[in-house]
Amino acid sequence: MSTLWGWVRYPFYTMSSMMGLGSAALYYYQNEIIYPRNIPAGARTEVPRPSQYEMPNSEELLLPTPDGETLSAFLMRPENKSQAAPVTILMFHGNAGNIGHRLPISRILVNGLNCTVLMLEYRGYGLSTGTPNEKGLVIDAQTGLDYVRSREDLRRNRIVVYGQSIGGAVAIDLVTKNQSAGDIKGLILENTFLSIAKMIPAALPAAKWLTPFCHEYWRSELLMPKITEMPVLFLSGLQDEIVPPAHMKQLFKLCQAKTVVWKELPYGDHNSTVGEKGYFEYIDAFLEEHVLGKR
């Protein structure tokens, strides 16, 4: 009987050990999973520059944070100042890669929509120093906004915060804390999520039992109802294979802003939504009608 019990309990001990190891791995290495800043290869050292994407009126910046990190950033403006829209877009990119990989997006915002764009690199990504975590990225976002506010040549522009995926969570947090100042005139969100805890079962189904061990939160679902003082545009790729489109729909329903615009990109997946027909037309219309009040 004792021998039989030994064989019976062996799988339970093995499973218990695996769960323990998995829990420890998620707890101690979750930042490597949540913030894959080394993907693709060379992402920390090879950063394309605005001059390579027909944006000559650009500045390559190094912004110091209050906690001692240095953030890489690009400030890009329309070449023809007389045609420039009085809009500054503070852009927070999605996960992996670096700001250089998103220059095709900013090129359309700058050369097509005539907006000024500040694209900020998170700590630990690209050429920025440090290691990414929720607390740090919150500081980084505030550093970017404070920089825009400090520029005399941008003072008359209307600030619009634009976030994709993890950048959407960063944007929501920043706007919630700064909307009372009255200088943020719009928020644009693409394929972002309710919270990290609710993302784990979708992105890593086998690890859903490890959710309680997650110490990165990004609770956008709790912050979204607090955003009331500016128009919000939701851009949802309905084929998103990483963030379930239901997350975006729920954030839309939670939003209490007076003006909330919902736009679906039927064939857009997590990374291709930005390339879908209508994407930039939706942004242009949102800026014209709800930020600049021209329509």
Regions found by a protein language model. Give the residues of each.
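An N-terminal hydrophobic leader/cap segment in hydrolases
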Residues: 13-62
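Membrane-embedded segments
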Residues: 66-147
